[in-house]
C-alpha cells in the first residue's frame, strides 16, 4: 500500500496514477476524507487526555478551594468523552486503510499509458524463429503424439485443467527446474523451497485483494490458502523485520508448486497443460534499496532473458500498459516466447518492480544496525520458469516432422544424455 504521507502531501500524484490505471478516484478521495477525520479526532483525543491530566493534578488544590466535586464532575465528563471518541478514531483508521488497500501503486514514468493491452510496447526481440519444411503442430497435438500427459484421466480424478505428466515429459519438467535453479544459484541467488500454504493474514499482505476470489484456493476449516506463486511466501520471508543495509540486495530463487483457480480465464486454453490449476514454478525475488531498485529490475530481467536464450526459445520483451498492471506493480515487463505451432507469442514470464508498495504491507524495512532510522525497502519479483508453459513452448519450437521433440542442448545433461523424445 502507499505511504499515508503521500495522500497528505502529494495527493495529485496519486490521483494522476489512478487515472493512468483508468480507475475511478473514489478510493483516493475516501482515504483523504477518513484520514482527515482520523487526524482531527486524534487531535481532539490528545487535547482531552491533556485536559484530564490537568484536572487530575488539580484535585488537591480543588479540595482546598472547596470545588472538588465540580472538578471531579468535569473529569468524569472528559473521561466519558475520551471513551466515546476512542472507538470512533479506531473506526476512522480502519475505514481509511480499507480504502488505502484499494489504491494501486504509483505508475512508473516508463509505463505506457493505455486502457488496452493491444498497446503493450515491444521493447526488444531475441532469437530467430525456427524454420520448418512442414506444417508445425501446436503443443496440444504434440504432447499427445509423444504421450507426455494425460488430461482426460486427470479430469475424471480432479476436474478440468489438471493432468498427469508422463514419461519423458516428467523428466523434462524436472530438468527445467534443475537448470533454472542452477543458473540462478550461479548468479548469487539463495535457493529455497517454500511452504505451499499461507495464512490468511499473510496472504492479505502479500496478495491482491481480487486474488482471493479469482485465484486462491481456501483450505476449509483452516486459516490457510494454497499459494498461487512463491512470490507470496518469499515476500513474507522477512515480514516485520529490519534488514541491515549492508546485506542488500538480497536475491532469492524458490521452487514451489503453484495453485490457481483461474476463475477469470474461463474458456481460455482449456486443452493441454498451458493454463492449469497446478504447476511448478521457479520464482525470483529481490529485496533492494530504493536507490538501486530500478537497476535491480534491469538485472532481474537480464538474468531471466539469459535462461530463455540458453534454452534457444525466441522471445520478445513487452512493457505492460498501465491499465493492466496489478496493484502491487509500479512497472512490469513480460517475456513472451514464440509458439510457432500456434503462430503467436505467449507470456512465459512477468518481471515486476513493486517499489515500496508491497514491503509496506508486510512491514519489511532496512537500515544501519542500531541506527534507529529504518525505512521501507523495495521488492521485485520475476518468474524464472513456469515449467508446464515452458514445456509447451519447447514442444512447438523443437518439434520434428515425425512428431518427435529435440531436447534443448542445455537440458541434455539433466535428461541423462537423452537428446530426443520420440513420438509414440
From Swiss-Prot:
InterPro entries assigned: aa-tRNA-synt_IIb, aa-tRNA-synth_II, aa-tRNA-synth_II/BPL/LPL, Ser-tRNA-ligase_type_1, Ser-tRNA-synth_1_N, SerRS_1_N_sf, SerRS_core, tRNA-bd_arm
Subcellular location: Cytoplasm
Origin superkingdom: Archaea
Enzyme Commission number(s): 6.1.1.11
SUPFAM superfamilies: Class II aaRS and biotin synthetases, tRNA-binding arm
Catalytic activity: tRNA(Ser) + L-serine + ATP = L-seryl-tRNA(Ser) + AMP + diphosphate + H(+); tRNA(Sec) + L-serine + ATP = L-seryl-tRNA(Sec) + AMP + diphosphate + H(+)
Record has Cytoplasm as a keyword: yes
Keyword field contains Protease: no
Pfam families named among the record's database cross-references: Seryl_tRNA_N, tRNA-synt_2b
Protein family according to the UniProt entry: Belongs to the class-II aminoacyl-tRNA synthetase family. Type-1 seryl-tRNA synthetase subfamily.
Domain free text: Consists of two distinct domains, a catalytic core and a N-terminal extension that is involved in tRNA binding.
Function, as annotated: Catalyzes the attachment of serine to tRNA(Ser). Is also able to aminoacylate tRNA(Sec) with serine, to form the misacylated tRNA L-seryl-tRNA(Sec), which will be further converted into selenocysteinyl-tRNA(Sec).
NCBIfam families cross-referenced by the UniProt entry: serS
Protein name: Serine--tRNA ligase
Organism of this sequence: Methanosphaera stadtmanae (strain ATCC 43021 / DSM 3091 / JCM 11832 / MCB-3)
Gene this chain is encoded by: serS
